[in-house]
């Protein structure tokens, strides 16, 4: 897991960045205005250094993306990485926030898709795929909205499959070995971790679910 060093000045850099939405609650229900269009909004919870969501924003200019990260020191890396990009990516913003507050930031139906990539295996109640979190996602997802979850952690994946069932969500697709699943690999965008793990020969698990 990433060691979280408290980088000096990270708070100030984040507060001064045009890429970071400083008071996200004020945009609840009006994200289209911030982006300047009504394209579908997709979010990544726990985006780490931001490679996945920056690649997604570049590949899909017809969608709007919001990358959510809880830690200043990690978000700082994403901001720095983004500053070095040649292109502008007007369809991408970052937020520093705790994912437990998602329903304060997005209106019911405002989010089209939620990406969870290699989430930290917290104590069970705090897993991003626990029933408590699925309830939060349900409060912001569009009627046809989906959650996509990738991890290399098999116990976490199996726990998540159980939670999905218990919470009454529908499993659209799942695999224990994403990189050998032609259908689910279509258009797959890798995260930093994913590249490292799969290069080491570790299978990546993935599920797509909806309410």
Where do the PLM segments sit?
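Short alpha-helix adjacent to the SAM-binding motif of class I
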Residues: 76-81, 159
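S-adenosyl-L-methionine
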Residues: 1-41, 51-58, 80-109
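Class I S-adenosyl-L-methionine
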Residues: 162, 166-211
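A short glycine-rich, Lys/Arg-flanked "PGG" loop and its adjoining helix->strand segment in the class I
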Residues: 129-143
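Conserved beta-strand signature within the Rossmann-like core of class I S-adenosyl-L-methionine
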Residues: 144-151
């Amino acid at each position: 897991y990433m060691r979280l060093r408290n980088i000096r000045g990270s708070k100030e850099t984040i507060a001064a960045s045009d890429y970071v939405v400083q008071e996200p609650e004020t945009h609840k229900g009006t994200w289209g205005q911030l982006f300047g269009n009504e394209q579908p909004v997709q979010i990544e919870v726990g985006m780490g250094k931001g490679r996945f969501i920056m690649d997604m924003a570049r590949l899909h200019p017809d969608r709007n993306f919001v990358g959510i990260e809880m830690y200043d020191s990690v978000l700082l890396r994403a901001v720095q990485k983004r500053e070095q990009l040649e292109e502008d990516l007007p369809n991408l913003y970052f937020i520093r926030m705790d994912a437990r507050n998602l329903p304060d930031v997005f209106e019911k139906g405002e989010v089209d898709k939620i990406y969870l990539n290699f989430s930290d295996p917290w104590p069970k109640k705090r897993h991003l795929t626990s029933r408590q979190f699925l309830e939060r996602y349900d409060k912001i997802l569009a009627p046809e909205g989906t959650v996509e979850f990738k991890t290399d952690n098999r116990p976490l994946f199996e726990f998540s499959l159980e939670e999905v069932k218990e919470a009454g969500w529908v499993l659209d697709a799942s695999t224990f070995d994403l990189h050998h699943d032609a259908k689910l690999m279509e258009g797959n965008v890798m995260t930093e971790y994913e590249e490292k793990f799969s290069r080491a020969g570790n299978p990546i698990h993935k599920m797509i679910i909806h309410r």
